[in-house]
Amino acid sequence: RRQRQMCIRDSTGCPGSMARSMERAPVNQPASFIPMPSQLRQWPVQIKLVPVNAPYFDGASLLIAADCTAYAYANFHQDFIRGKVTLVGCPKLDDVDYSEKLTEILRQNNIKSVTVVRMEVPCCGGLEYAVRTALQNCGKLLPWQVKTISIKGELLDD
C-alpha cells in the first residue's frame, strides 16, 4: 500500500510518469474513410461529477475507465464504450478515493455488469482497487472484468 501511495503522490518516482516517445509507422487512411460516431451515452462522465442516482444507471452495463485509456487505445469507443454507461477518472490526479461513490452507484442502481479499463502503469491500480472495494461493499454479486491497455496502446492479455 505504501508503494501505491508513493506512486500516486510523487510523480517523479512513479514509472507511469516517465516521459517516453513511441515511434510509429505512418498509417494510410483508406480513400473511403467514414468517421465513426461517438458511442458515449450519457453526461457527465467524470466519476467525481456523476450523480449516484442518475436515471441512466438503471439496467446499465457500467464501464469504469482510467482517463488515459481512451487516448492510448485507438478503438476505445467501439470496443469498450458501445452499449455501456461510461465513467472515467484518474486515481493519480484526482485526490479522492472513488470506492465510496462507486459503492453507492452500485448499491442504489440496477447495474448489470462492470468493466474496468485501466492502463498498465502501477498508479492505475488505484482505479481497479476502488472498483474491487465497491463491488465487495455494495451488497450485490455483479459480474465484472478488468481490461488492461499498454502504454503503446495495445490490449494486454488477461
Where are each of the predicted segments found?
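Extended, compositionally biased low-complexity polar/Lys-Gly-rich tracts
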Residues: 1-2, 41
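Local cysteine-cluster metal-coordination motifs and their immediate loop/turn environment
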Residues: 12-18, 65-72, 118-129
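Short, ordered loop/turn segments at secondary-structure junctions
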Residues: 91-93, 119-121, 149
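C-terminal folded domains that constitute the principal catalytic or ligand-binding module
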Residues: 99, 103-119, 126-147, 158
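Short, small-residue-biased leader/transition segments that mark boundaries at the very start
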Residues: 3-8
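Short, conserved secondary-structure transition motifs
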Residues: 149-155
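Conserved mixed alpha/beta catalytic, RNA-binding, or beta-rich assembly cores of soluble enzyme
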Residues: 19, 24-101
